[in-house]
């Protein structure tokens, strides 16, 4: 592993541990030349997933797009980046579990909505308002009524 400070190719692993629910190995390294310490992450290389968008165009699947979309929806909400990361991990796992190389963008949006409904209702509504691109307020009101009813059912249990 090349040192980010001096560019030397020799480094020693100081610490190694599992991260992201065991899907990644986090290694703390020290450069043998300049003693600079840095962190690397190792994960299994997955097959490439292609997202088919509404207009028919295709692009490579990006965890970052999902993560950033959720981060925007969760602004000023009590949702940690670790929680969001776990949501993104679950979504990616579900998508890869399908054994399909191409995934519809609507399927990804639906999975995000399912996860956010469990995580935080306000984040869910914010994401839904962009994802579903409501035509008028009545569509948003309908969604809010659904959420209110499901919240009442959860509390009754």
From Swiss-Prot:
Which segments carry the region annotation Disordered? 1-22
Leader sequence range is none
| Sorted UniProt keywords | ATP-binding, DNA-binding, Metal-binding, Nucleotide-binding, Repressor, Transcription, Transcription regulation, Zinc, Zinc-finger
* Keyword check for Nucleotidyltransferase: no
Q: Which GO terms describe its molecular function?
A: ATP binding; DNA binding; zinc ion binding
According to its UniProt entry, the protein's GO biological process terms are: negative regulation of DNA-templated transcription
* Cofactor requirement: Zn(2+)
unnamed zinc-finger residues: 3-34
Co-factor binding comment: Binds 1 zinc ion.
Q: Which regions form coiled coils?
A: none
Query: Which stretches make up the ATP-cone domain?
Result: 49-139
The UniProt entry, under PROSITE patterns, shows: ATP_CONE (PS51161)
Q: Which InterPro entries match?
A: ATP-cone_dom, NrdR-like_N, RNR_NrdR-like
Report the HAMAP family cross-referenced here: NrdR (MF_00440)
Cited NCBIfam families: transcriptional regulator NrdR (TIGR00244)
* Role of this protein: Negatively regulates transcription of bacterial ribonucleotide reductase nrd genes and operons by binding to NrdR-boxes.
Please report which protein family the annotation says this sequence is part of: Belongs to the NrdR family.
- Specify the protein name: Transcriptional repressor NrdR
Which source organism? Streptococcus pneumoniae serotype 4 (strain ATCC BAA-334 / TIGR4)
Instruction: From the UniProt record, report the name of the gene that encodes this protein.
Output: nrdR
